[in-house]
Amino acid sequence: MGTPQGGVISPLLANIFLHDMDRAFHEPGGPYEFANARLVRYADDFVVLARWMGPRVVRWIEQQIDAARLVLNMDKTDTKRLRRDGASLDFLGFTLRFDRDLRGRNWRYLNVFPSKKAIERIHERMRELTASGYKRSLPDAIQEVNGVLRGWANYFRYGYPRSAFRDLNRFVQCRFLRFLRNRSQRRSRPFRQGETLYRGLMRYGLVQL
């Protein structure tokens, strides 16, 4: 038996079954004590952070999962050393990676930004809302796109999302260019005489991240 992934009740069941692990993690004899580790969990997704992820920590987690009669998803289970070049961690739509300082200083900072999968998903949603078969007026389409963009930006505003936001702005503008071309026999349809696509979209209130 089980529940569909993404089901309404799945997060509730995950919190019930994993609550004991949360508590035991911080009790005497748990990884918080013997490895100075930290546990970050959301529903059934969790990350354990420690300076050294030894076999004792891994074994403790496996025992807790077994005790809850759950099974680890081995496709999503891995041990990483984030300070190695190129190593990264994807969690809850974010990518975490230590990058070299852009000013040339001899240290690294923890770069947090939207993951590749999160960007692919928002691109697909923008394609849906600006598709040729999407029968909406330009103002209505912009209003719906704005709602999705605001929600996405509010979620990913933490860390360093500026590059991802800038790229998404360009992607959305290109999608609206195709949106307008599909509604005219001409290759483009300016909003006003001499008005650029960017200024026209801004006048209609398109959100810029």
Show which residues each predicted segment covers.
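Non-catalytic terminal/accessory segments
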Residues: 1-209
